[in-house]
């Protein structure tokens, strides 16, 4: 038998991978788990219908994977990245083919990075971070190993991801798919969203690079800032997605309210941000709102300190009989 013979070992060492794979399939105990139909509801719309367990996150069954992937439903609902669902399914329900049955195929590093860039700002906003078990650093690069990306999959109906006209090698969400939910600048919204920065700025340029849109603006006035330094100069507002929401027009002047990425010292223009045409009246309103917000914050702090002091005092005299004695 070729597999067990010295000649077979020599052939294996010589790099005849096809023969080696055949040998492994025939050796008892070396057989890998077979492909199985995708049963994870979130992943049934993806362009592959066969997967294999355990997956890249070491879930032994799809039932376990379903419970784990459900935690991302809320993040998927924000549409923070067109690559997020593809990336998650490539990790939780990896594609399985006859040619690659021994080890699930990993998603490409670039897919992970695009998903993280688009969605990490949303996670940061709610005091979370990108999950460590979904780290991009260890994933293969497209031209150095076997991996999958949306660009590499063409369905019977053609490519699911249209070509980006600004980069022939990049495919992403088309601008026609971007539906921005308008948010008006009101005191209620300002209090609820608690923005990290508010600036008056003129839009100089909108840069589109693959799955990222960046707005280049000239800062005219800083109405509010937090930890990230904002110069009275040209700065970038990072959307970290293929959509510019809220929309901006070049050469127009806006009042912009958004969030920041402290770790990267970036100003973010993401879901929940506001951009309205600049009006002096609106600028004055926002300054008043911010003063109220600061006052409310101080009042709450003073109130809690007062309550704490009062409770300590009342604690010492909690028993009237003891006090009289």
UniProtKB/Swiss-Prot annotation:
Domain of life: Eukaryota
Disulfide bond sites: 35-96, 43-89, 80-119, 108-147, 112-136
Residue ranges, compositional bias (Low complexity): 299-314
Polar residues bias: start-end ranges: 315-325
Protein's cellular compartments: Secreted
Signal sequence bounds: 1-32
Expression sites by tissue: Expressed primarily in the cartilaginous cores of the long bone during embryonic and fetal development and in the appendicular skeleton (6-13 weeks). At 13 weeks of gestation, transcripts were present in early chondroblasts of the tarsal bones of the foot, the carpal bones of the hands and the epiphysis of long bones. Highly expressed in placenta and heart, followed by brain, skeletal muscle, kidney and pancreas. Weakly expressed in lung and liver.
Span of domain NTR: 178-298
One Gene Ontology MF term: Wnt-protein binding
Keywords for the protein's UniProt record, in alphabetical order: Developmental protein, Differentiation, Disease variant, Disulfide bond, Glycoprotein, Secreted, Signal, Wnt signaling pathway
Stretches the record annotates as Disordered: 297-325
Family matches, as Pfam families: Fz, NTR
Database matches in SMART domains: C345C, FRI
InterPro entries, A to Z: Frizzled/SFRP, Frizzled_dom, Frizzled_dom_sf, Netrin_domain, Netrin_module_non-TIMP, NTR_Sfrp3, SFRP3_CRD, TIMP-like_OB-fold
Domain FZ: 33-150
Glycosylated residues (UniProt): 49
Gene Ontology process terms (BP): canonical Wnt signaling pathway; cochlea morphogenesis; convergent extension involved in organogenesis; epithelial cell development; hepatocyte differentiation; negative regulation of canonical Wnt signaling pathway; negative regulation of cartilage development; negative regulation of cell development
CDD domains: CRD_SFRP3, NTR_Sfrp3_like
Family annotation (SUPFAM superfamilies): Frizzled cysteine-rich domain (SSF63501), TIMP-like (SSF50242)
Recorded disease: Osteoarthritis 1: A degenerative disease of the joints characterized by degradation of the hyaline articular cartilage and remodeling of the subchondral bone with sclerosis. Clinical symptoms include pain and joint stiffness often leading to significant disability and joint replacement.
Subunit details: Interacts with MYOC.
Domain remarks: The FZ domain is involved in binding with Wnt ligands.
Summary of the function given for this chain in its UniProt record: Soluble frizzled-related proteins (sFRPS) function as modulators of Wnt signaling through direct interaction with Wnts. They have a role in regulating cell growth and differentiation in specific cell types. SFRP3/FRZB appears to be involved in limb skeletogenesis. Antagonist of Wnt8 signaling. Regulates chondrocyte maturation and long bone development.
Name of the protein this chain belongs to: Secreted frizzled-related protein 3
Organism: Homo sapiens
Gene that this polypeptide is encoded by: FRZB
């Amino acid at each position: 038998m070729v597999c067990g013979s010295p000649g077979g070992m020599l052939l294996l060492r010589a790099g005849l991978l096809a023969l080696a794979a055949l040998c492994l399939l025939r050796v008892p105990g070396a057989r890998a788990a077979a492909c199985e139909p995708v049963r994870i509801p979130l992943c049934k719309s993806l362009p592959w219908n066969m997967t294999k367990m355990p997956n890249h996150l070491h879930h032994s069954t799809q039932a376990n994977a379903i419970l784990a992937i459900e935690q991302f439903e809320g993040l998927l609902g924000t549409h923070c990245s067109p690559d997020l669902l593809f990336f998650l399914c490539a990790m939780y329900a990896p594609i399985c083919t006859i040619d690659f049955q021994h080890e699930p195929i990993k998603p490409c590093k670039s897919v992970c990075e695009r998903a993280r860039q688009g969605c990490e700002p949303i996670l940061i906003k709610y005091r979370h971070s990108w999950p460590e078990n979904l780290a991009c650093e260890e994933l293969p690069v497209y031209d150095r190993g076997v991996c999958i990306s949306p660009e590499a999959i063409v369905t019977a109906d053609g490519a699911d991801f249209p070509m980006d006209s600004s980069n022939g090698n990049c495919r992403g969400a088309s601008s026609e798919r971007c539906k921005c939910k308008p948010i008006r600048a009101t005191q209620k919204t300002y209090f609820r969203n608690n923005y990290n920065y508010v600036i008056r700025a003129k839009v100089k340029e909108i840069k589109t690079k693959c799955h990222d849109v960046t707005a280049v603006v000239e800062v005219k006035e800083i109405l509010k800032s937090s930890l990230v330094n904002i110069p009275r100069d040209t700065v970038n507002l990072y959307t970290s997605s293929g959509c510019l929401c809220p929309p901006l027009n070049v050469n127009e002047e806006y009042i912009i309210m958004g969030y920041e990425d402290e770790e990267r010292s970036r100003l973010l223009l993401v879901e929940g941000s506001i951009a309205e045409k600049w009006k002096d009246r609106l600028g004055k309103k926002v300054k008043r709102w911010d003063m109220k917000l600061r006052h409310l914050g101080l009042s709450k702090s003073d109130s809690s300190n007062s309550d704490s002091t009062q409770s300590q005092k009342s604690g010492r005299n909690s028993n009237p009989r003891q006090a009289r004695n």
